[in-house]
């Protein structure tokens, strides 16, 4: 470092002096002192007496114990663990526009799919707080996708590029761990937060053997999905069948409502790989190609409809075990997207 970095440790209002600050703040200050003369000048300053909010440069670094409150909002800050880790590992202190509390996501570029606006905002905030970058689009630089659906273009692209697809619980787990330990968000320790291959999918079958049906039920249930014995246009996402079952009632209903029809091997192979594989190699000949999993198109918006249990099967409900006649489907019940 050619120029000194001024590192100011802020004493919160509830503490009378630095001795009452958290152990982590004091350890971080000690780490800075060990580098005094090497480009770092550290000092303690009470929050209640600090008045300088203008004229600051990238050489002015503030360390606070909590990322909240008026003081936090007015300054760009780093956390004590961020300081300690940077000094221990001999890497530069972050100087970007966002506050950085830890460096658990340093070097990562994260995007999200299928989540609410509020969830995405929280992910963006936490990623920045952990030294990572957040993007609204999936690019060549993207390293991780956070999603709650396998029915999106981002998911398909992520699988094609072998990018990890994580649940939003990954963000919180890494955040909580990084407050206590010097960890890397890309570590295999967080593999249990990967998005299951059939996450939030409802799957049904038609015309396959009892043995194959039992296997499909088991794999779907164990890997984040839900198995249903009946087809219902508002909730069914995938119909699993053999090539000689294309005359079944469920198959006809799937065609009418644009649902994906695939071979049982799609379920088996996807479960083995740990991701929902593209459907192009598993699609039953003549079946719908509207699924984003096969053709990279926008997801069927009916996947987001509320799932309502009816006392009486609606007209767009097919349960072959009850010999429901497909002719009862009324055109006025058809979902129009």
Language-model segments: residues:
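Eukaryotic intrinsically disordered, low-complexity regulatory regions
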Residues: 1-337
